[in-house]
Amino acid sequence: GLGGRLDATNVVVPLVSVVTNIGLEHTDLLGNTIERIAFEKAGIIKNNVPVVTGAKGNALQIIKKIAKERNAPLFAVERYADAKFDYLNGDFQQQNKDIVLTTINALKKFHPIKINQKQIKKGIKKTQWQGRLQFISKNVLVDCAHNPSGFEVLKKELKIIKNRRKINNFIFVVGIQKDKNIMEILNMIIPLISTIIFTKSKNENASAPQELLKIFNKINNEKPIETKIMDSPKKALSYARKIADKNDLIVVTGSIYLVEYVI
């Protein structure tokens, strides 16, 4: 969903509103600046309803302003350094954990909910997030990153994985939706790639692999990278497995619709 003012769920008056963080997403509908998107996301803030946010910088200032106008108590996300969270891959999950704990505290302050530390720990321990930095086998990682901010996180995590597991090469299986910033996304991952296989999901908004390859060739004029086009995610993954050595890592990414076909 879009999230924010234009999201269908915004008809509901919640116990607490949460704006996790702000990135350049759905720019055709929400605007092409962080400030404009922050304004749209802040559209979920209701009169007298507490709001939690992990936003920073200018985005946070806009959310603060709107929260004040609507008399909505604002909770900027606190860091809970003593609450370790290692049930999901990725350092960014620590921030997600902090958002959850801040939200629970906001709920407890304004509503008579009964929830104790033991229940919170149990809930966090059972958390699952399929398709986000998920290893579906020893050398196949799937990640549903589909915008520049998501790929920034993925890129950071892959560097950590490379050092920890002594990865030789990354083989990417990539499919991206037409409405995404394809050039920026591909440009971000070029330094990591040894081989890239372009494919597409069955979603009607999926970019043609040929178009992705065309854009890729336009921006990559320095690094020798093997490229391939396959007409389905499963065929692309099968080919990647065929060419991968034991110290290589296959990364399937670019679209939630793509990832669903391989997990």
Label the model's feature ranges.
Residues G1-A55:
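Flexible active-site lid/hinge loop adjacent to a nucleotide/diphosphate
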Residues R5-V18, I22-G23, R36, A83-T195:
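Nucleotide phosphate-binding/pyrophosphate-handling subdomain across enzymes
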Residues R5-D7, A59-L60, L258-E260:
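Short, active-site-adjacent cap segments at secondary-structure transitions
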Residues H26-N32, K84-F85, N205-Q210:
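Short, charged, surface-exposed secondary-structure boundary motifs
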Residues S255:
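Active-site-proximal loop/hinge segments that shape catalytic or ion-binding/gating pockets
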Residues G43-V51, I161, R165-F170, L192-T195, ...:
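Short, surface-exposed connector motifs at secondary-structure boundaries
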Residues V52, K56-F75, Q94, V140, ...:
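C-terminal helical cap/extension that packs against the catalytic core
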